[in-house]
Amino acid sequence: KRGLRSRKPIGFRQWVVHHFCDRYRVIAPDTRGHGKSPRGTSPFTIRQFSCDLYDFMKNHRIPKAVILGFSDGANIAMRFAMKHPDMVTALILNGGNLDAKGVKRSTQLPIEIGYKIAKHFAKRSAEANKNAELLGLMVNDPNIEPEELAQITAPTLVICGTKDMIREDHTRKIAENIPNARLAIIEGDHFVANKRSEEFNREVDRFLESL
């Protein structure tokens, strides 16, 4: 069984990947432009990252996998599971969102301001262009309609924190619109996988054991 991690690596490998690697075959690829993965020339979007995951699994002869995604990784996982349901054994979505409105305004507003500033200087600065691409993911993506989630056929665990940057009603909407989904809310913020690793891993273990 294999997992997909988010584009935010801090703590995730240490607290989640390490926990599962003794019982499962865990693969944690970096999305394009992150870690050791080249940026390439394709669009820097959640849809493209989903296509990249498809290519990655095909190239590594992985016919089917349990996919775990955090934040943008959860958004990639949703897109992937909708388009390639036959390649998903189960889905674990931690801190994902359907659109920018799912993010609490207190968090989203600084992101939007930063995006506008970075975009303004993008043509004159490689660093600003990189920041514009990163922030653009949180401003312009993933744009998933709730009804589209019905295309996800795999058993799904949706996880969030009680003080998550994603609105709780938005997370509940995700769980309610995926046919075979269960919801787990853990005390903590957006980074419960790191800060509340025991509770997080316990929920994931319970879910995987039920498959």
Predicted regions and their residues:
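Short beta-strand/loop motif that positions the catalytic acidic residue
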Residues: 152, 158-160
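Conserved acidic catalytic loop of the alpha/beta-hydrolase fold
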Residues: 47-65
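Catalytic histidine neighborhood in serine/cysteine hydrolases
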Residues: 175-191
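Conserved alpha/beta-hydrolase "acid-adjacent" motif
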Residues: 165-170
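Conserved HGGG/HGGXW glycine-rich cap/lid loop of the alpha/beta-hydrolase fold
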Residues: 1-36
